[in-house]
Amino acid sequence: MNENTLKEIVRRCYLQYLSREPDDAGLKHYVHLMQTGQINEKSLIDTFKNSPEYKLAHPVEIEPDTPVDIKMKKEWNERAKMNHLFVIATNHSESEEDFWESGITECNAILGKGTNRFQNIIKNKEPSKMNVLEIGCGIGRILIPMRKIFGNMTGIDISSEMVRLGQKYVTNIPNCSIVENNGIDLSEFPDNYFDFCFSFIVFQHIPEKKIVEKYISEVSRVLKPNCLFRFQVRGTIASKPNQITTWDGVQFASDEIHKIAQANNFEIIEEGNDKDEYYWLTFRLNSINSSSRIQK
């Protein structure tokens, strides 16, 4: 086969198994291996399917027609078993010390300690009496340091394995709990219960927009009027994955977010750049009866 044909084979394998275009170095490397007879297309596929990159996106074999909530739960359980520190905080997984220190940093950044955001979060409330919810808490990296600020912290996670690991850290902390949820709603919580909700590096892994939208709708139900929801989604970054998975999830543009906010009785009081991977938003729930929300 000529070089162009080999390049196309390598490119096709990258797109199918790694969900991205090949970088120049990778393309040259695998074309050279095929030209010299060291690998063929089958062994190239095997190489990709055994790579850490592929296993993050596809940690376990699942039937194509598996419901998305079951798929998310199974795949995140497997990721937690592989390396829970890495899949929670990829850039802070070299040591447990770095991992937990990063949680303190992220806690302060989310709350905006020393800024107007923090004042808006605790407005007219005593922090020691506030109920706070984290969506997608993992093993409690951010939840645990935040419990020093607020009266009661609840973290939910779709992965029973993450919950099992996390409960070891919160067992003796009376105002902090980690519970498993179904990954698609907040049905275990009553209306108007929380004083603040937040989520970080969670919605970016969800493979369907309707699930993210459902979570936002559910937050508008469980959050008290005039309280805040601080969260992050994946913006419309240039390096969009070729295949949406439970690792490389959906992206949102600003106009979509504004429509979702309006439909769920939220006012956007902070908005980051929707072209960033970490597209941050702060919503405030308007103080009208929840039954007045636009039904979707």
Question: Which residues make up each language-model segment?
Answer:
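Substrate/cofactor-recognition hotspot
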Residues: 1-61
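Helix-turn-helix-type domain boundary/helix-start signal
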Residues: 16-20, 187, 250
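Class I (Rossmann-like) S-adenosyl-L-methionine-dependent methyltransferase catalytic domain
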Residues: 62-133, 138-186, 209-210, 228-296
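Active-site acidic short loop of glycosyltransferases
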Residues: 173, 191-192, 225
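A short acidic, Gly/Pro-enriched loop at the edge of an enzyme's catalytic core
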Residues: 187-197
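A short SAM/SAH-binding and catalytic strip from SAM-dependent methyltransferases
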Residues: 196-210
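A short glycine-rich, Lys/Arg-flanked "PGG" loop and its adjoining helix->strand segment in the class I
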Residues: 213-225
